């Protein structure tokens, strides 16, 4: 069985007489996914070098040499001139090798003092995630803005609101579109809240027990744009609840987008006929020439399942791990990396889809009163006349039976038919027996009346802009 040298490409050795077996090395290897942390690793190493210098563990000349070498290494990583070798176990070992190649083993070998891969990777993961969630948040806000723009373009268009996918009450199309913005805005707020907890640096925690070399965790935390350093070194190196929290919010974004995607799929069918998809955001069939498929929406549904799976897998990895660090945590990054990558693919496509939707408002208006959607308006009109709601509810239901029996809408009932159901149903009830009257009457905060929807639109735009400030 072939073996590596005891320290080739790795940050450990010495007590071993031989390196790991080839299969063991392959199992341990993580450069194929953790290389995305390389720019953060170099930044953290630059900060660590300054902390070592401040503690008297690195002389002025060595500090200058090390920072110069790290700067050159950072440039080579960015350009692709420096990449991991086959023998490198992980991003940390690869970069130490790169530094030693540039400044020699005497200076390069000093950087490892006072830090462990345990506190190092926990810090880098947080740094990467804090940047990643801001990118995701901006993509989510692009969708919010596209929905708001469509809402503003259709201020008076009406449609049938549904519960249980059955006709319920008429609403404004703008009201419905804005209903999708609020969960997405909350998702961005969750990312912002997550960032508060992620902004705690594990650096200086060592393997688990902290440092004995007089290093300053607060100094390195400040340089790396953290709000503070960790209060407990064992917790800092072994906990990944920050990763699980991020994975949850990313999955929740997927769920919220999947719900919207499902409506796009339904609305684009001939049976609904509410929308036409732009050619740029549709695909065809290899055999059926007439097809125009809502693939963006279907892929959104599919990827939401993938995001949920990433969260579930991560939680399963984290359960039952005793304190402190365990190698299981090598499995913590790929699910989160993948969730971010999937959303970065998905969000621009959904933005383009939403921005180019063509709404058939005449079709929506035609269906708005169908299915007796004005029945609740009859009941509530009776309540305003002093009729108890239980009685009013039964009277409105009786009106539905009469209309259904003769294949008419509620608005088509005669004065005699209305009075025959309940004498309280005078001709004045007709003020709510129109879609426009029904919508205008729902003018409480949050309702579908035009004035309230305009308020909602303003609030959505204001909150979106405020959240963009955090992203920047």
Swiss-Prot record:
It is found in: Cytoplasm. The gene is argH. Its main location: cytoplasm. One of its GO terms (molecular function) is argininosuccinate lyase activity. Pfam families: ASL_C2, Lyase_1. Gene3D superfamilies: Fumarase/aspartase (C-terminal domain), Fumarase/aspartase (Central domain), Fumarase/aspartase (N-terminal domain). GO terms for cellular component: cytosol. It catalyses: 2-(N(omega)-L-arginino)succinate = fumarate + L-arginine. This is Argininosuccinate lyase. Transmembrane segments: none annotated. Pathway: Amino-acid biosynthesis; L-arginine biosynthesis; L-arginine from L-ornithine and carbamoyl phosphate: step 3/3. Belongs to the lyase 1 family. Argininosuccinate lyase subfamily. It comes from Rhodococcus opacus (strain B4). InterPro entries: Arg_succ_lyase_C (IPR029419), Argininosuccinate_lyase (IPR009049), Fumarase/histidase_N (IPR024083), Fumarate_lyase_CS (IPR020557), Fumarate_lyase_fam (IPR000362), Fumarate_lyase_N (IPR022761), L-Aspartase-like (IPR008948).
């Amino acid at each position: 069985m072939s073996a590596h040298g005891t320290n080739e490409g790795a940050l450990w050795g010495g007590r071993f007489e031989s390196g790991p077996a080839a299969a063991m090395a392959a199992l341990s290897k993580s450069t194929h996914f953790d290389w995305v942390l390389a720019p953060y690793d170099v930044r953290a190493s630059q900060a660590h070098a300054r902390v070592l210098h401040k503690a008297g563990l690195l002389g002025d000349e060595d500090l200058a040499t090390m920072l110069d070498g790290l700067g050159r290494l950072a440039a080579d990583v960015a350009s692709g001139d420096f990449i991991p070798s086959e023998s490198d176990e992980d991003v940390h070992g690869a970069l130490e090798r790169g530094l030693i190649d540039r400044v020699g083993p005497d200076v390069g070998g000093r950087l490892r003092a006072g830090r462990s891969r345990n506190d190092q990777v926990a810090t880098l993961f947080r740094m990467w995630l804090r940047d990643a969630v801001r990118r995701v948040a901006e993509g989510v806000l692009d969708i919010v803005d596209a929905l708001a723009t469509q809402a503003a373009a259709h201020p008076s268009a009406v449609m049938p609101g549904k519960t249980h996918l059955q006709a319920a009450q008429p609403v404004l199309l703008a009201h419905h579109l804005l209903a999708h913005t609020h969960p997405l805005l909350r998702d961005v707020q969750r990312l912002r809240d997550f960032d508060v907890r992620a902004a705690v640096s594990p650096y200086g925690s060592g393997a688990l027990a902290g440092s004995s070399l007089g290093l300053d965790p607060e100094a390195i935390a400040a340089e790396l744009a953290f709000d503070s350093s960790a209060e407990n070194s064992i917790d800092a190196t072994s906990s990944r609840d920050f990763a699980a929290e991020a994975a949850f919010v990313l999955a929740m974004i997927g769920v919220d987008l999947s719900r919207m995607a499902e409506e796009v799929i339904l609305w684009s069918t001939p049976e609904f006929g509410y929308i036409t998809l732009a050619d740029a955001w549709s695909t065809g069939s290899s055999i059926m020439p007439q097809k125009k498929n809502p693939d963006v929406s279907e892929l959104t549904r599919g990827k939401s399942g993938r995001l949920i799976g990433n969260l579930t897998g991560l939680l399963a990895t984290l359960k039952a791990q005793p304190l402190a660090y365990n190698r299981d945590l090598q499995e913590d990054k790929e699910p989160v990396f993948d969730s971010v990558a999937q959303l970065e693919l998905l969000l621009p496509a959904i933005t383009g889809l939403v921005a180019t939707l063509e709404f058939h408002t005449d079709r929506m208006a035609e269906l708005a009163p169908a299915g007796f959607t004005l029945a609740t308006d009859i009941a509530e009109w009776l309540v305003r006349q002093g009729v108890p709601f239980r009685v009013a509810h039964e009277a409105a239901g009786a009106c539905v039976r009469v209309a259904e029996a003769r294949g008419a809408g509620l608005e088509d009932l005669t004065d005699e038919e209305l009075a025959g159901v309940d004498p309280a149903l005078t001709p004045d009830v007709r003020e709510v027996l129109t879609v426009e009257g029904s919508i205008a009457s729902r003018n409480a905060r949050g309702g579908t009346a035009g004035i309230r929807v305009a308020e909602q639109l303003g609030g959505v735009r204001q909150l979106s802009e405020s959240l963009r400030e955090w992203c920047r």
